[in-house]
Amino acid sequence: GVRLVGSEMCIRDRFKLTPGIFALWYLVTGQFKAALRAAAAGLATIAIGFAAMPTASWEYWTHYMVTPNRLGGLTWAGNQSLSGLLLRLEHGNHTLVWLVLVALCCVLAGVASRRLWQGGGADQVWSLLCAGLCGCLVSPVSWSHHWVWGSLIIVAGLADRRRCQQVLALIWALATLTWMVWWFPAGHNRELAATWWQKILTDAYELVGVATLVALARNRRRCESGVSAPRT
């Protein structure tokens, strides 16, 4: 039940690192008990892993976790992360630029998530969606099928009466349902030869993801319904 909030998320994180962003989301939104449970559950699962397979666990945490290149094909259009975007722009060392973008993205998502959470109601759903987008953006590898958050934004936006959220839903529908990231030749580093406008469409998820965070972080009041309040 309620006592498992945070623990379940961090247990999932130990099996797959992508949900780990939500442990930070608990902190940003002031859900401190859930954050503590997430931290405790995470440390417990790591300890169990070391007890069961010490050598494999050590290799994973000290080597494999920090070497995404082991997955191969990181310039592939299917890698819809900020790192993938940079690799397709300049096929070389982009670590410093990536770290700066990751920091900015985390701040942006944190501001948006906190403001939306404090708004209560449907805004708390959008707060969670901001965390999901941030996780996909900052991960070194985010395959296109990780971007289920786009589908959730479509559903949430169409169910929301506010114009900003509805526009975001339409933009995400255009980006995802048209499969525009696959419109051009992909694989075997063919993405590197694409023109600038082809790269923009190929990196649709990252660009729309950042734009969504900006729109929601500016001020949640600006995403209110376009209907004016009655004059007195």
Segments from the language model and where they lie:
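Single conserved hydrophobic/aromatic residue that forms the stacking wall/gate
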Residues: 1-6, 11
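Short hydrophobic/aromatic segments of transmembrane alpha-helices and their interfaces
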Residues: 7, 17, 126-127
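Aromatic-enriched
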Residues: 158-232
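Primarily membrane-embedded glycan-assembly and transfer machineries that use lipid-linked glycans
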Residues: 29-147, 151, 155, 192-198, ...
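Transmembrane helices and adjacent periplasmic/lumenal helix-loop junctions
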Residues: 11-26, 138-146
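Internal amphipathic alpha-helical segments of the cytochrome P450 catalytic fold
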Residues: 1, 20-21, 33
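Active-site catalytic microenvironments for nucleophilic, acid-base chemistry
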Residues: 26, 155-156, 160
